[in-house]
Amino acid sequence: MKIAILSDIHSNIFALEAVIAHFKRKSVDMVVNLGDILYGPIAPQATYERLRALEDEFNVVTIRGNQDRQIYEADEAELESNPTMAFIHEDLTSDAMDWMRALPFDRQLTDYLYLCHGTPDNDLIYLLEDVSS
């Protein structure tokens, strides 16, 4: 089974379209989206709509990232102090917000494939490698 893995789209519809074209050429069987989908100043609603349309073409599994959660948890103070967040809230429909809220934190896809954004316990912790010679 060929699985295309997406992550950290950050509302970049243009990059998303290029990636979709690539994995269509590769004849993938499934698309896995690891979150951080709509936070960004480019095109949150258009990105949401494209991803939902992708579900008509492929078996798509999506989990939420930390910034997806931060979008629907944003309060008035955050919207006033963060122009990007304010733009996202203005751009997204209630359907898009509801979709994000419903995304799971993680998913056990198979016996050997576990999906999460960050670590299994915390979506704010980054897995970083310290590579030395």
Task: Kindly label every feature range from the protein language model.
Residues 2-97:
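Core catalytic region of metal-dependent phosphoesterases/phosphodiesterases
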Residues 79-133:
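Acidic, His/Gly-enriched loop-helix segments that form or flank divalent-metal centers
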